Amino acid sequence: MTVQFAADKTNIPGRQLFRKWVGAALNKPAEIVIRIVGMQEGEVLNRKFRGKDSATNVLTFVYSDDVPLLGDIVLCAPVISREAEQQNKDLVAHYAHLIVHGVLHLQGYDHISDEDAVVMESLETKIITRLNYPDPYVIQQ
């Protein structure tokens, strides 16, 4: 696993935590690149690959679903920080959730249908709580 910091590293968890989170969500051998980007790169990637005119928190790119699984997870640091603040979530816990979310996407899970979303969110919650973080789908007051 490779972690690329293309954004200011302030308040971004370290490589060891990313490795721990990926390991908790992964069910097969993989070669994964995690890239943490700023707002500008986040906007460019989301526009190019999803047709959206703003940055999003996480993008996942699967290159091979064979063994080893090959893919990239792109995290937009400013979006993640803003969401954590708006949702009263611990920033590290939010990063953990988004990494788990991205790794599940790499393994073929999605949330396009309501049924698939229930399955994926249930897995995310199970993994995140096993890592001793709060359920990411419970609104914090």
Curated annotation (Swiss-Prot):
Cofactor binding mode and count: Binds 1 zinc ion.
Origin: domain of life: Bacteria
GO cellular component: cytoplasm
UniProt keyword terms in alphabetical order: Cytoplasm, Endonuclease, Hydrolase, Metal-binding, Nuclease, Ribosome biogenesis, rRNA processing, Zinc
GO molecular function, one term: RNA endonuclease activity
A Pfam family matched in the record: YbeY
Necessary cofactors: Zn(2+)
Subcellular location: Cytoplasm
UniProt-listed SUPFAM superfamilies: Metalloproteases ('zincins'), catalytic domain
Tagged with keyword Cytoplasm: yes
The keyword Metal-binding appears for this protein: yes
GO process annotations (BP): rRNA processing
Task performed by this protein: Single strand-specific metallo-endoribonuclease involved in late-stage 70S ribosome quality control and in maturation of the 3' terminus of the 16S rRNA.
Family matches, as PANTHER family: ENDORIBONUCLEASE YBEY, CHLOROPLASTIC
Name recorded for this polypeptide: Endoribonuclease YbeY
Record organism: Nitrosomonas eutropha (strain DSM 101675 / C91 / Nm57)
Gene symbol of the encoding locus: ybeY
